[in-house]
Amino acid sequence: MNDSEFHQLADELMLQLEETLDQFEGDADIDSEINGGVMTLSFENGSKIVINRQEPLHQIWLATKTGGYHFTLREERWVCDRSGEDFIALLSSACSAQAGETVHFE
């Protein structure tokens, strides 16, 4: 994957996340902000989740209340380098924990 392809895929991922949050109908108030390729999700309890792209490594990084994760694209999925877990599944789980209700990004 070259840098241009990485940027396109990362942009598509951020757009998908933003659209999902815009359509979220739960009780939790989850605010999202994108600035310089970094997406910050802010929750009512003051906690945050940060998603950013690491261009030199062609990775997506996720920082949650419980830890940091690095994801590489494998077979059209962003997969955690450490656990092999899918980005969307891990993000959904982290958002659900921090929002206090179920949040799905799929």
Curated annotation (Swiss-Prot):
It comes from the Bacteria. Keywords: Iron, Metal-binding. The keyword Amino-acid biosynthesis does not apply. GO terms for molecular function: ferric iron binding; ferrous iron binding. One of its GO terms (cellular component) is cytosol. GO terms for biological process: iron-sulfur cluster assembly. The keyword Acetylation does not apply. Pfam families: Frataxin_Cyay. SMART domains: Frataxin_Cyay. Belongs to the frataxin family. Involved in iron-sulfur (Fe-S) cluster assembly. May act as a regulator of Fe-S biogenesis. HAMAP family: CyaY. This is Iron-sulfur cluster assembly protein CyaY. The lineage of its organism: Bacteria, Pseudomonadati, Pseudomonadota, Gammaproteobacteria, Enterobacterales.
